[in-house]
């Protein structure tokens, strides 16, 4: 039986603007760190999300954060969230120690995670029901354009996983198909039900096991 999360710690990222995060970890020493990106409009106080993060933290150290303009984080939501996400991935080891790093996210946060899959030190990335709905309706919307620019790069060099519900908008499913056509190491898992169901068992434990296995293997390879 996996150890339950024994650490749940509010964290403030002392940037400009100041951002709120949550750090969770199991009782046993974690082998992998997960930086998790929330969906547009979501906060760390959401009950279903909190339960999901607790389940992930049975295996992993989890750093989840509220983008600027959401929840208790300062600033205004916009294209800068991509830079914030990249900074968190880059500076995490200096703040919390060195561990193999996996990035993940839900909804818009899923696309943020995939956009960071080629960042230095990232061992793998996953996206739960990735959605561009919160990035603006028009292709020229600043955040949507920033994500397009982030994806205009060579193929991702690490394993990626997209998990989505069977009952989802056709445009969102097609965006995933386009991503996978350019990502030779990408995998897709379609679950029964809706995208909202992906925060419920058995998916937190399933994704955590995947992240731990991939991250641990990358850490051993780096030794």
Spell out what each predicted region is:
Residues 40-53:
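The serine-hydrolase catalytic nucleophile loop
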Residues 76-95:
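Alpha/beta-hydrolase active-site loop
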Residues 135-181:
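The feature captures the conserved acid-bearing segment of alpha/beta-hydrolase catalytic domains
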Residues 105-109, 113:
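Gly/Ala-rich beta-loop-alpha elbow adjacent to hydrolase catalytic centers
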